[in-house]
A protein has these predicted regions:
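A polyanion-binding, active-site-adjacent surface
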Residues: 1-206
Length: 206
């Protein structure tokens, strides 16, 4: 039915996360494992890893790519102009509470080191944590903030982001929807209307 309202669907994608499974049995256990993780160089420059914020019973999970300098220094997931915009998007368009209705985390849990590129080594260290969080939370919808977060979640590095942005993608046991990152919208305010439409589609799925 949703197709008749302009919704775009993409065929299901299966990501094999079996080799990545951890022994942790709760979101809190995963958070403790992240806090004690020193598998890559990013752990050396971080103030503290950001393990995830929000409700462990949330049906909506938001995944950013990496921890920003502002987030790392403040410990606040919604710090800075980008964070403030994301909070407004969640509260004013999705009509969700950032503490009780969502779980916000990052694909890469620590602030990148200066001049770091690619993040493949760091992603290989972090991806087990992210997929374990998804496995434990069992969200209905996962929102990827930007191209990089989408690529980490889907394993698709080549897809033109404009082609999949806003599409409803069946990914294993949940629905994945990629939207523009708030930092992109701050630089390209003309795209806010597009992001608003994407968020309205997500709200209709809840």
């Amino acid at each position: 039915m949703l197709k008749s309202f302009g919704y775009s669907y993409i065929d299901s994608i299966n990501i094999d996360t079996t080799p990545l499974q951890l022994d942790q049995n709760s979101i809190e256990d995963v958070a403790n494992a992240i806090k004690n993780c020193y598998l890559c160089d990013f752990s050396k420059s971080r103030k503290a890893p950001l393990t995830g914020s929000g409700s462990s019973s949330a049906k909506v999970m938001i995944v950013d790519h990496t921890v920003s300098l502002t987030q790392d220094s403040s410990g606040n997931y919604f710090a800075g102009k980008s964070g403030e915009m994301l909070q407004a998007m969640v509260e004013n368009v999705l009509h969700l509470d950032t503490k009780n209705d969502i779980f916000f985390t990052h694909a890469i849990k620590c602030k990148p080191s200066p001049h770091a590129k690619g993040f493949e080594v760091e992603w290989n260290s972090c991806k087990s944590y992210l997929f374990k969080q998804i496995d434990l939370l069992k969200p209905k919808i996962v929102i990827a903030l930007g191209k990089e977060a989408y690529a980490k979640l889907s394993g698709d590095k080549e897809e033109n982001f404009q082609n999949i942005r806003g599409s409803i993608i069946k990914l294993n046991s949940y629905t994945l929807v990629a939207i523009h990152h708030p930092s992109y919208l701050l630089k390209n305010p003309q795209e806010k209307r597009v992001a608003f439409g994407d968020l309205q589609r997500i709200e209709a799925l809840l």
